[in-house]
Amino acid sequence: MTTQPRIKTTVVGSYPFPDWLGALPSEQAVIDATRVVIHTQEQAGIDLVCDGEFSRFDVNHPETNGMIEYFVRPMAGMRTAITFDELVAYRAQRGMGFRTRPPAVVEGAVGAGTLDLPHACARSRRLTTRPFKFTLTGPHMLAKSVIDKHYRSVPDLAMAIGDALADQVRHLDADVVQVDEANLPGSPDEWQWAAAAINRVLDDPGGYGDRGRVIM
């Protein structure tokens, strides 16, 4: 009788972006790179595989590999054209040293817009028969990265982004959903509203069921 390990192995999520994919990006190239990453994990005996996050990379946004842009720019309520005055104000903010440009400006109520995480998830899910983990950037990080001219409150914006992400999560074909919050360790005093926004994503009763949840 084969028993499953109580503690399963996995990887953080993102993989180094291969040069050849950046030189010749296409839907098929993303699939090929993802297949290599997943197969490497399977060969190593990883229990819970993930896709390397290649579909989110953007060579035009090297500071964070286009990760933030991937999530916020398709959302409703976001403006992507940034004025010079907005750039100057953004660069003067504390905690934004890792970026020189905002990914977007919030000008209206945030919604899912054209964001389609289920498509990216399904594309990777088809490449493995192992348990699959899908990762996404969390509402705390996303809310703090944009310029907010609508909510005028980062916690309120984070809640709205959390709701938009929850709409996506309920449709994901993944065994585990991982929320990445890289900015939160540097802002521990924001934990209460950050936790509330993250819970908006992961505690959605609309279909999440018994799937695993991870916060990084």
Question: Which residues are covered by each model-predicted region?
Answer:
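Domain-level signal for soluble alpha/beta catalytic cores
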Residues: 1-216
